[in-house]
Amino acid sequence: MPILTCRYKILFLYNLRNCFTFQNQRCLIPYGTTTTIRWYNANFQAVQNNFSDYKNELISSHRPEASSLLDFLVKDQKKSGDISLHTKFNLYVDDLLKKSEKGQIKKFINDIKKDLATESQLPLSAPFKDESTRTMTDPQVLAYIHQSMPYQYASLYSVLTDLKIVNSDVSCKSQHILDCGKGPGIGALASYSVFPTPNSVSIVEENPFLKKIIYDIHHNIYPSTSPNPTSPVTLNRLPLGKKDSYTLVIASNKLLEMKSEKELFDYLRSLWSLVSNDGGLLVLCERGTKRGFSLIQRARTFLLQKSKNTSDKQFNAHIVAPCPHDGRCPIDIENGVRANICSFKQHFFLSPFSRLYVPRSHRRSSDRSHYSYVVIQKGITRPLNNTTQRFKNDEDLLENVNVTSPTLKNWPRIIRPPLKRDGHVIIDVCDSDARLRRNIVPKSQGKLAYRLARKSAWGDLFPLEGKVQSTSPSSKITKHLKDASSTYSINPPSYNKPKVERNTTADPIFVGKRFYSTNRHKAFSRFADFNSHRFPCIFTSFSCYNCISGTRKYSRQYSRDKFHYNQRTTIYYLVAISIFALGLTYAAVPLYRLFCSKTGYGGTLNTDQSRMNAERMVPRKDNKRIRVTFNGDVAGNLSWKLWPQQREIYVLPGETALGFYTAENTSDHDIVGVATYNIVPGQAAVYFSKVACFCFEEQKLDAHEKVDLPVFFFIDPEFADDPNMKDIDDILLSYTFFEARYDTNGNLLTKLN
């Protein structure tokens, strides 16, 4: 009992020491705890001396607080999200932007945004190339710095921090850094923040304006922010005469400038020749798009092939990060599947100059940099010890308290955001056997294991095996790259993959959109195998279908993307329907008039010229006569009179007839009128064919003038054969005159008053 009491006191005091801020051993805490603080100050030194003994006792008793492996996985490998450029850098760039012409800078910024949008939309087969800084004007350089410098710095800072974690020896060596990246020596700036002061720094840049910016930043600004400044050397081109001289070569956002594969491979050969044979490192970093990852994938394959094709051991190479293996990349980007790339994100705070030339509604204080990268070490092969070492439960995590650099290189890496569900965590990793694995870590696996899974993040090392695992289909040939001595094969196609048999253990988890469910698939497979002898046709076909497709279970991010896609699609359809309805509204009147004139619908006289022939103008004497009644009227205030000279005419179907109307101008001035007509009943209009009449023609009558207007017509013989017309004995032909009006161009305006 006294031992436990002392132990709890020590633990309480240690936690109290971590929770409060001290200034000359005075705690900034409320007044009510002064008694406790006096006792704490008196016993502080004794607690500090006894705490190391207590920690060793915890290690021996397997308590989780002392596990250095857990400390590494949960704390040490975590990257800070509080990344930002130094204030003096921000002030310098802000001053450059304010002195330049605002219109040109804004134009080039919009061009860069359009290029980024075009890159994400174009397929990989389409040609695309970034503009090199060699041909940029001064405003273009400033626009590129405004758009890319914070993102590029955050990406490189994250990559170099990860490199320092995985390969701890790199910080102990004498550093000779060569920065070949795009921009004002951003790789060198990031290396200053991660590694100790290097022995030498060289920056490759040809643009005169960028060289001036590099000089101002690295010679005037950086020395005032660092206790041990290093003056870099600016080079116009790669120093090919200094082969095997640099321990760290950084090339960021450069591969997209290459016009062809030959130029890309020549550039990679030149970079590789500059890397030191004694464990030198080559860092390649591009934007986290499909095209950027494709270039990183090509460079990775090419350099590994180059090292395998040489027998000299000093040219051996292996991947330091992010891949835990040197085999073929298991991610097949050619399928065009969403999220089918290996990329990572880094949170950072935007610089003040990044908010210039940005609408107020789009301004924000932080953002995320999306990038793909690879770090290759030259002259050293991958360590083979502990390649199969994995941890499954809390006891394994507590037994392994030592973390070494060779072990970290073979640990799986999380390649997608973990899916943290209620009671379990789903984690997708790239493993050391060149396969993609999905680990499901439930609460029942252990408190420490579940805590580790909940604390894991995208890009972390994750050596813990889940209680449930699914493996992507793979083959032995993916562990070794195919020899390509004559031609350089970049990510060769999958024709070497073996056929998947029915009883294979590979799960179709990584086929299709993104993820698939495994539990229901496995449960039904067992049920189908048990009952397949009873219903062979049903269960065999369903099992084959399930093995190929599986039951889809998308992540929350995919569900959100799908919702936004459906929302946008619905909006597009509504807009298209609205435009179509508006156009149909304007076209309805002339279309209806055309329809009526062709068919006679709605009482409109039939004007189809194909019916006006002599063969149809033959009377049907065996049919009854139809009485045609005439009517005349004028519209509005038109000072005319219109009346038919005959009230009615009896005609046979097919018999022609001639009728007359009389129009009189009763006013004291000349008037131009236009007549329209109608047929009643409307269904008979299709058979009422008009050969000649005065409708829709401008009729000018002088003051008090009177004229006769003829109407020559016949009823189509098909009228007698239509059963719907057998009860129709009377047809009314009505004409209406209205005054003609004209616009400023002399065109007739048909307006009824």
Curated annotation (Swiss-Prot):
Signal sequence region: none
An annotated Gene Ontology molecular function: methyltransferase activity
Nucleotide-binding as UniProt keyword: no
Highest rank taxon of the organism: Eukaryota
Disulfide bonds: none
A biological process from GO: mitochondrial cytochrome c oxidase assembly
Pfam family, one: CtaG_Cox11
Site (Cleavage): 568-569
Transit peptide: 1-39
Classification via InterPro entries: CtaG/Cox11_dom_sf, Cyt_c_oxidase_assmbl_CtaG, Ribosomal_Rsm22-like
Keyword entries, A-Z: Iron, Iron-sulfur, Membrane, Metal-binding, Mitochondrion, Mitochondrion inner membrane, Transit peptide, Transmembrane, Transmembrane helix
Residue spans, topological domain Mitochondrial intermembrane: 592-753
NCBIfam families (UniProt xref): PRK05089.1 (NF003465)
Family: In the N-terminal section; belongs to the methyltransferase superfamily. Rsm22 family.
Name of the protein in question: Rsm22-cox11 tandem protein 1, mitochondrial
Organism: Schizosaccharomyces pombe (strain 972 / ATCC 24843)
Name of the gene: cox1101
